[in-house]
């Protein structure tokens, strides 16, 4: 399924504050939603409700921790394939059915589907890419990480 760009009015000032603040971290406390919500002037329940809405409208695809698979003996790999436009959504569903797929994005390029694999072992990258190739009949191009970059995400408040 392709994601659509949200109109600016889809997010209010509170939504934008939530997105910006939670990029900075999340409290590791007995009641983290209460504590994160308080920093935003919300109750924990209101924060959860907002996060559920942001996910429902496609402003976020998930909410949860980001684990460094490589630091735990696993691996990450950026992958791409060239999916026929007429079959794009079906192929995306096959790719996304793999729990190792962390992100999947459509791009205007010959390699029009880009996704990240995160596996428990370095060998898992080749194994998962091979399963995706077998299921889709398409070549999965692998672009392993050479250097790590941290890109900050901010929305205009």
Swiss-Prot record:
Pfam families, alphabetized: AsnC_trans_reg2 (PF17805), NirdL-like_HTH (PF22451)
Function statement: Involved in heme d1 biosynthesis. Catalyzes the decarboxylation of siroheme into didecarboxysiroheme. Siroheme is probably decarboxylated to monodecarboxysiroheme, which is in turn decarboxylated to didecarboxysiroheme.
Recorded family membership: Belongs to the Ahb/Nir family.
Keyword terms of this UniProt record: Lyase
Organism: Paracoccus pantotrophus (Thiosphaera pantotropha)
UniProt enzyme class: lyase
EC number: 4.1.1.111
Reaction catalyzed: siroheme + 2 H(+) = 12,18-didecarboxysiroheme + 2 CO2
GO terms assigned for molecular function: lyase activity
Protein name: Siroheme decarboxylase NirG subunit
Gene3D superfamilies on file: 3.30.70.3460, Winged helix-like DNA-binding domain superfamily/Winged helix DNA-binding domain
Assembly with partners or alone: Forms a complex composed of NirDL, NirG and NirH. All proteins are required for the total conversion of siroheme to didecarboxysiroheme.
InterPro entries: AsnC_trans_reg2, HTH-Siroheme_Decarb, NirdL-like_HTH, WH-like_DNA-bd_sf
Pathway note: Porphyrin-containing compound metabolism
């Amino acid at each position: 399924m392709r994601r659509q760009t949200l109109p600016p009015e889809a997010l209010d000032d509170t939504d934008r504050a939530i997105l910006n603040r939670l990029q900075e971290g999340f409290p590791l406390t007995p009641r983290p939603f209460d504590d994160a919500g308080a920093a935003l002037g919300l109750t924990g329940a209101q924060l959860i409700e907002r996060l559920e809405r942001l996910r429902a409208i496609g402003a976020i695809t998930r909410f949860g921790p980001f684990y460094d698979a490589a630091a735990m003996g696993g691996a990450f790999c950026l992958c791409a394939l060239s999916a026929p436009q007429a079959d794009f959504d079906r192929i995306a569903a096959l790719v996304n059915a793999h729990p190792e797929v962390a992100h999947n994005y459509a791009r205007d390029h010959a390699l029009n589907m880009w996704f990240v694999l995160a596996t428990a072992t370095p060998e898992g990258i080749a194994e998962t890419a091979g399963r995706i190739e077998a299921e889709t009949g398409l070549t999965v191009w692998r672009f392993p990480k050479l250097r790590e970059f941290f890109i900050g995400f901010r929305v205009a408040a």
